Curated annotation (Swiss-Prot):
May have a role in promoting tumor progression. May block the TGFB1-enhanced cell growth. Overexpression of HYAL1 suppressed the growth rate of colon carcinoma cell tumors in an experimental model. This is Hyaluronidase-1. InterPro entries: Aldolase_TIM, Glycoside_hydrolase_SF, Hyaluronidase. The gene is Hyal1. Glycans are attached at residues 85, 114, 231, 252, 365. It comes from the Eukaryota. Residues 433-444 form the EGF-like domain. The keyword Glycoprotein applies.
Length: 449
């Protein structure tokens, strides 16, 4: 682990960072040409759920075995935050990410335009190789940088310090400039540097581990938090659409998009969760369709608790989060639990009971429905996507045709049943196909040349 230090190592040459990024981009392009379609853990699979939690501590510290392997959940060995299927980098674990502490102290320069990108990439090079020792890593590679956002306009409330300190830098250099010019220059400097840092880090990861699904947690965002509005629809505002459109470089560079659909506590009992989630996931698809790769996997981040509470989501809220994501044709979802939730025996027992009674059966239901729909409608070569005429339709199995039964000998839950003609007709009416890369046509039967 690197020592905590606010010091910044000056770049050896002002042009080095730009040259380094151009070199990485060239390497990445050559790799893509050589490999063609990147294979990954989500390739040609309708819907997967990834367990991104360190619940192994429940067994190690409290004797509570949260056995997620019995479900259709891809979990790392020992269920920790880094492994062959899933690696997440927090700010202390990848390079020398610049930010301000809650007391306003700069770390590694504080601002991206006041920090050394070359030093960061050199450290990140070693961090990536250490966290992902296998060159053919093909799992999810998530960067969790939340201190600042790459668009100036998105840095409000506690993030306003990045605007204020950016303007201070410009004032110090140009004390005679009017405030309008100071802010315009500060905005330009900040956004240019933010792009260099975020794009450069992605490019480095993609060069070192080209099969990994590299992307940033929480991007894109819809900022649709006005739950108390009596006319709340959940839709992203036009101004948010415009700002997200300016981040084309980020969507073009990402190998996966990881929007957050954590449910804030304010949504409890409001009946607005599905609207909230729907437009956050839709925004990811909107941006993916105009990016360099319209097939980029969408993998929303889901919590099983209401955010910052100890209240587990009821089944209907799982339908509004996991279920909504699957119905829109997401490649899967990442289930995350904070380490605080695994720190007590009581919390671990609650998680285990929830997994056994609610979450596990629901995951098996949704993933099985997605697979059966893919085979029935899309020739097994695409994902079922909800038809706009049926905005409430979910990919779940009919209880008249299927049953999910627990076993008593430690083996996984069992699914029994077959699709009836009525089930197939309902799927065909409410869903259509989004074909995997290389396939097209209404039923994904045509192989692209």
């Amino acid at each position: 682990m690197k020592p905590f230090s606010p010091e910044v190592s000056p770049d050896p040459c002002p042009a080095t960072a730009a040259h380094l990024l151009r070199t990485y981009t060239l390497f990445l392009t050559l790799l893509e040409l050589a490999q063609g379609c990147r294979g990954s853990m989500v390739s040609n699979r309708p819907f997967i759920t990834v367990w991104n939690a360190d619940t192994h501590w429940c067994l190690k510290d409290h004797g509570v075995d949260v056995d997620v392997s019995v479900f259709d959940v891809v979990a790392n060995k020992e269920q920790n935050f880094q492994g062959p299927n899933m690696t997440i980098f927090y700010r202390e674990e990848l390079g020398t990410y610049p930010y301000y502490t809650p007391t306003g102290e700069p770390v590694f320069g504080g601002l991206p335009q006041n920090a050394s990108l070359v030093t960061h990439l050199a450290h990140a090079f070693q961090d990536i190789k250490a966290a992902m020792p296998e060159p053919d890593f093909s799992g999810l590679a998530v960067i969790d940088w939340e201190a600042w956002r790459p668009r100036w306009a998105f840095n409000w409330d506690s993030k306003d310090i990045y605007q204020q300190r950016s303007m201070e830098l410009v004032r110090a250099e140009h004390p005679d400039w009017p405030e309008t010019l100071v802010e315009a220059e500060a905005q330009g400097q900040f956004q240019e540097a933010a792009e260099a840092w975020m794009a450069g880090t992605l490019q480095l990861g993609q060069v070192l581990r080209p099969r990994g699904l590299w992307g940033y947690y929480g991007f894109p965002d819809c900022y649709n938090y006005d739950f108390l509005s009596p006319n709340y629809t959940g839709q992203c505002s036009l101004s948010i659409h415009d700002q997200n459109d300016q981040l084309g470089w980020l969507w073009n560079q990402s190998y996966a998009l990881y929007p957050s659909i954590y449910l804030p506590a304010a949504l409890m009992g409001t009946g607005k969760s599905q609207m909230y989630v729907r437009y956050r996931v839709q925004e990811a698809f909107r941006l993916a369709l105009v990016s360099r790769d319209p097939h980029v996997p969408i993998m929303p981040y889901v919590q099983i608790f209401y955010e910052k509470t100890d209240y587990l989501l009821p089944l209907e809220e799982l339908e509004h989060s996991l279920g909504e994501s699957a119905a829109q044709g997401a490649a899967g979802a990442v289930l995350w639990i904070s380490s605080e939730k695994t720190s007590t025996k009581e919390s671990c027992q609650a998680i285990k009971a929830y997994m056994d009674s609610t979450l596990g059966p629901f995951i098996l239901n949704v993933t099985s429905a997605a697979l059966l729909c893919s085979e029935a409608l899309c020739s097994g070569r695409g994902r079922c996507v909800r038809h706009p005429s049926y905005p409430e339709a979910l990919l779940t199995l009919s209880p008249a045709s299927f049953s999910i039964e627990p076993t008593h000998d430690g083996r996984p839950l069992s699914l029994k049943g077959t699709l009836s003609l009525k089930d197939r007709a309902q799927m065909a009416m409410k869903f259509k196909c989004r074909c995997y890369r290389g396939w097209s046509g209404e039923w994904c039967k045509k192989q692209d040349m």
